[in-house]
From Swiss-Prot:
This is Non-structural protein 2. InterPro entries: Rota_NS35_C, Rota_NS35_N, Rotavirus_NSP2, Rotavirus_NSP2_C, Rotavirus_NSP2_N. Belongs to the rotavirus NSP2 family. Its main location: host cell. Residues 205-241 are annotated as: RNA-binding. The keyword Magnesium applies. It holds the Pfam family Rota_NS35_C. The active site is at H225.
Length: 317
């Protein structure tokens, strides 16, 4: 995750702003600079290489002292920064909005995946600039639309029906901010269209998840898509979701946290997010993740007969 101000800076033209990507030499200069405390939140002028990000964001970059940041000296950083600027420059950002836009925290890996989709000549985003920019505006929170299959970050498609597409995320192969844990495995499920879904399609998805991904929990971060994650990583996801939700509420950005379909979401996660929306503390909410829940009546009778036992997957073993 990183603020948009880590990728670009605004330049006032007439009554709106044009966004310009940083180059990595300017960032490198900023990372070595001594800056007074009062200037930490201001864009840094490297004199030689142009404008650089505010020094308060130093920890967002990978250095000898901080291996958890972005690999800003890669070509991928430049590609992501340019893509963000293209999207922001396609709309009008006024002086009253610019600070809020640049302070927004976005998923670096999501944006790298959109670059990969853009460069894949078999992908619809390669052929449609309009759809590409729409995908980026959704990714950076500038659009209220949810991420659907056409505008998704992408990955490897492992399941699809008339309503849903399930992607295996490819973060291990990333250049900008790769996941280093070689045991990482996670999926995302997007809606093909943002419209009501038939019970038949939901039943097909639940059957797939129950038989092929029975070692995973289905959760949501509230943004209109599902995540399929290892049970061992659920607590970590809970911490992140709770922190994001509370920070947004504190800054006055009211989030419409989408709980999604209770028949698909893991029961304990649904309880956790419902409790969070009611205003309870993190400790109170997290206890619900580890409680034994009363099994609800199966909304899909006969579901277990949809697959033969020899089809049970070993994904996640």
């Amino acid at each position: 995750m990183a603020e948009l101000a880590c990728f670009c800076y605004p330049h006032l033209e007439n009554d709106s702003y044009k966004f310009i990507p940083f180059n990595n030499l300017a960032i490198k200069c900023m990372l070595t600079a001594k800056v007074e405390k009062k200037d930490q939140d201001k864009f840094y002028n490297s004199i030689v290489y142009g404008i650089a990000p505010p020094p308060q964001f130093k920890k967002r970059y990978n250095t000898s002292d901080n291996s958890r940041g972005m690999n800003y000296e890669t070509i991928m950083f430049n590609k992501v920064a340019v893509l963000i600027c293209e999207a922001l420059n396609s709309i009008k950002i006024t002086q009253s909005d610019v600070a809020n836009v640049l302070s927004r925290v976005v998923s670096v890996r999501h944006l790298e995946n959109l670059v990969l989709r853009k460069e894949n000549h078999q992908d619809v985003l390669f052929h449609s600039k309009e759809l590409l920019l729409k995908s980026v505006l959704i990714a950076i929170g500038q659009s209220k639309e949810i991420e659907t299959t056409a505008t998704a970050e992408g990955g490897e498609i492992v399941f699809q029906n008339a309503a849903f597409t399930m992607w295996k995320l490819t973060y291990l192969d990333h250049k900008l901010m790769p996941i280093l844990d070689q045991n990482f495995i996670e999926y995302k499920i997007t809606l093909n269209e943002d419209k009501p879904i038939s019970d038949v399609c939901i039943k097909e998805l639940v059957a797939e998840l129950r038989w092929q991904y029975n070692r995973f929990a289905v959760i949501t971060h509230g943004k209109g898509h599902y995540r399929v994650v290892k049970y061992s990583s659920v607590a970590n996801h809970a911490d992140r979701v709770f922190a994001t939700y509370k920070n947004s509420a504190k800054s006055g950005n009211v989030i419409d946290f989408n709980l999604l379909d209770q028949r698909i979401i893991w029961q304990n996660w649904y309880a956790f997010t419902s409790s969070m929306k009611q205003g309870n503390t993190l400790d109170v909410c997290k206890k619900l993740l580890f409680q034994k829940m009363k099994q609800e009546k199966n909304p899909f009778k006969g579901l277990s007969t949809d697959r033969k036992m020899d089809e049970v997957s070993h994904v996640g073993i």
